[in-house]
Amino acid sequence: MDRTPVDLVPALKDAYLRKVAFTKGCETVELTFHVLRRALGSREREQDRVAGFRFRGVRGLATEALRWDRDAAKWVQAKVDWLGALARDQMERPIVNGASVGLDVTLERWRKAAESALWLRGQPANLDPEVQGIVAVAPVIFELTAEVILPSGINANARLFLAADGLDVVGSKGPRDLGALLREGEDWTAKWRDYWRRRERRPELPEDPQFEWMQPTEDDLR
């Protein structure tokens, strides 16, 4: 299956997963992000940071949450439906670590986690192209990793796998595309780096909250 691989880290890293919504049976899934890596223009407002991902014709949806077991000294499955808890507004907003569309390695990771993951739609057999591979041949393969605080108050590393027939991206002003999101993320990174270089030379300059929230390392400013 030919898919265009897109690494969404430049756009979605550090974003908040603000909202989750899905139909009964999860045929349609909507994820709403509050994007921090976007430099707002003078006429833009905070609502312009919103990016909605709407997945149509969902073939498979699975999640996992790994917590650190101090007694066993290893990561173990928390066995919690964190996505459902978020949809019911029962937990704090996850912070995105990574996201991608169309990466072959996503299917590899999904297969490794298939038996222990919580399947909200589909089943592990759907990952096998020689059996019931409706997931393996899906036009859209999406993966998300995030830091979460579970309803119990425990910190965990969460992952979401999703296979669908289509993906629509929507912003505050209407339809968007992944390329535009990536360009905005790359533009923010360039402006963030320039901002901190100026601040390094002239500490008296006023702070800009669009960039101040993330402190740079020495390597970032080289």
Task: Place the predicted regions along the sequence by residue.
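Surface-exposed, interaction-prone regions used to assemble/regulate multi-protein complexes
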Residues: 1-222
